[in-house]
Structure formats: C-alpha cells, structure tokens
C-alpha cells in the first residue's frame, strides 16, 4: 500500500503494509520530518485521530491501495523549512554560482537573455542569493495571480469571453508543458546549429563557401568575384531581380570558372548577386551537377571518393559568427532559390542598348549636302543603301517565339530568351525553367 504522509511544509510517500503499527508510522515520521514523538499527532483523511500506537493501519480502515494521513505537530510552533537557517545553504548557493561562472555558454546566454541574473552571478554570493530569493518571490506571485485569474474566470461559467480566456490559458499551459518536456528530454533542440561551410578555391583564390541545398543556384558576391579575378567573365544579359522574401539585384552570370574542392578541380557557374551576406553560396545546381553528398554523420561533403570537411564554429567567416544563422539563411536562401527564374533577362532591369538609331556605318548625317550625298552613295555601294537593324521580333522565327510562349513565357521574355541563347530554342527553354 502506498501511504502518503502530509506535513505542514512537506509531503512524504512510503510503501507500507496495512498491518503496520501506528508506532512504526510515528517512527517513520520522526526520521523523515525530524520531529520528536511527543509532538506528533496523526490523523486519517477521514479525520480520525490515530492515537493508539498498538493498533494497525488496517484497524483504522486504511487498507486500500493508497492511503493518506495528516501530520499535525503540537507544542511550540515549528519553523518552516524556508525559515530554518541551514549552514550549508550559502555553500550550495556559492557552488551553483561557481558552476555558472565556469560555463561560458551559459554565461553568454544569460548576458543576452537575463542581464539581471548575469550581474548577480558576477556580484558574489550574497548578490546571487538575493537574485534567487527574488526569483522565488516572483514565481510565487505569478502562481497567486494565475490562481486569482482562474477564480475570476470561473465566477461566471456562462461568460463567453471568460471561457475563451480559460481556453487560451489551458492552451498556453500545454505549450509550456511541451517546452519543459523538450528542455528535459531533448535540450539539444534549443542550441544553435553551426551552418555548413567548406574551404574552396575559386580561380586559385581561397574562399569559405556556404553550402545550401535549399538554394536553387550557386551565388557569388561582386566583391568576391573581383578578388577571384572572374568578374571580367560576367554576362550581363542575365541581369535581373531575384525575388523572395526580399529582393536582390542580379548583375549577371559567370558561365564557367574553376573551383577546387579538396583535391578536385571542377567547373562551376555563378550568379552574381548584390548585397549578399556571404561571399560564395554553393547551391543545389552544382551539388546535383557534381553529385555531391552532404554526410552529416561524418560532417563532410562527399564528392565521389573525396571528402571535404565542414568547418567548425571557430573557423567560420566573421560574417557568419557575428550574425545569427536564421538571419543569414533568410537573406540568402529565398533570393537564391528564385535567382535563375527571375533573373534571366528580367524586364525589371533596363537592358543596355546601343546609343544610336541603328544605321549602318557611314550612313550618319552630316552638315553638307555634298558630304551627305557622297556618304549615301558610298554606303549604297557597300550595303545597298541605308540598313536599319531589324527589330528583335523579326530576327527570330515566329515559330520559335511561339514555342516559348506556349511554355508559359510572355512574348517579350521569349524574345529576350532567344537573344540570350543566340536563337537556340532548347537553351532558351532551359533558361525559362531554371
């Protein structure tokens, strides 16, 4: 039988037999509650005093699977456990404070989330003790206020607003229980995850690349492209706007540059984006092209039989250490994920055109009529007269334009795609679908 002994300031549970004598129960209480037998008065949950030490629990009707008795000390009032001075209490508090001081990760979290406790820990034992007492007082006040609100809400069971508040309170209690369960059984879920970076070389220049399988394209910043000496290969026909949660300007595309991963030298294409928070983002296009495997069990990026280790936290670039991972990922991933589709000759960025009327060489106007006649005749001899550049829609076959329109591209974008691909419909279609 499970016997619960409820004292004024504590609760004790014991597995006992119903045939146990009351005297034995008194001895148990004496040992657990540290009270002399003369001041111990036991009462059953039915209010029956257990005064005869020679009788058993069963004789008082306490013979079920569980039973409860109440302990009521007599004589001089007994101080509660919270008011009894324990000589080891300060030592325990100091031990707790020193443990916190010896945990740099905990101290960093306290500095950001609870500066008051952080200052109390650094202020010494008494300061930390006052902070603990204040926290306990706040907890008691919060429990009291919670109970008061529950009583106020239960005062009118037909009040719809009160019932909604009760429902929300129940929901929040479930949320807190779920959080406490997670903190107890999976505390690692509350830690920060180190983003995946690797050491690479672009055109012989060392770069720390961010590996992101959620980004559609591989991205490089203009500054990094300049440092690597590949900005001269930028194809501005692929300029546009990348739109996700935010927007970023696509300067163009570098179709092929040499990148070194481990001992492998591989070709890699880059989209050049302004305002990115990383120098190089290794996206899904290159991961799939080179059949890379992100192996988190070995913390490596595996390409065939070559393994490139991911960088540890202290090796990350300064940008990644200074900024939160969620902020970095949010700024990079969305624009990268839609970079190609939104960035191929996007009409949002005006395309640079030749600053003239499109006349052939030698057909420009002049001040003298003789010069104009001579120029026109000379031009006519070479080109058959004034030759205007055909409009973009006349340069390409109508069937090719219609093919791209049928695939979902507006007519203007279809013409731009054909210009970017040199009239190759298959290449233009691949650009359309990223």
UniProtKB/Swiss-Prot annotation:
Active site, UniProt feature: 212
Annotated keywords: Aspartyl protease, Cytoplasm, Hydrolase, Protease, Protein transport, Transport
InterPro entries: Peptidase_aspartic_DDI1-type, Peptidase_aspartic_dom_sf, UBA, UBA-like_sf, Ubiquitin-like_domsf
SUPFAM superfamilies on file: Acid proteases, UBA-like, Ubiquitin-like
Main location: cytoplasm
One annotated GO molecular function: aspartic-type endopeptidase activity
Residue ranges of the region described as Disordered: 315-396
Residue ranges annotated for the Ubiquitin-like domain, each copy included: 1-77
Biased composition (Basic and acidic residues): 315-325
EC number(s) on file: 3.4.23.-
One Pfam family hit: UBA
Bias (Low complexity) ranges: 368-388
Gene Ontology biological process terms from the UniProt entry: protein transport; proteolysis
Boundaries of every UBA domain copy: 395-434
Keyword Transport: yes
Subcellular location: Cytoplasm
Hydrolase found in the keyword field: yes
Domain of life, source organism: Eukaryota
Protein family (similarity comment): Belongs to the DDI1 family.
Function statement: Probable aspartic protease. May be involved in the regulation of exocytosis. Acts as a linker between the 19S proteasome and polyubiquitinated proteins via UBA domain interactions with ubiquitin for their subsequent degradation. Required for S-phase checkpoint control.
Protein name: DNA damage-inducible protein 1
Organism: Cryptococcus neoformans var. neoformans serotype D (strain JEC21 / ATCC MYA-565) (Filobasidiella neoformans)
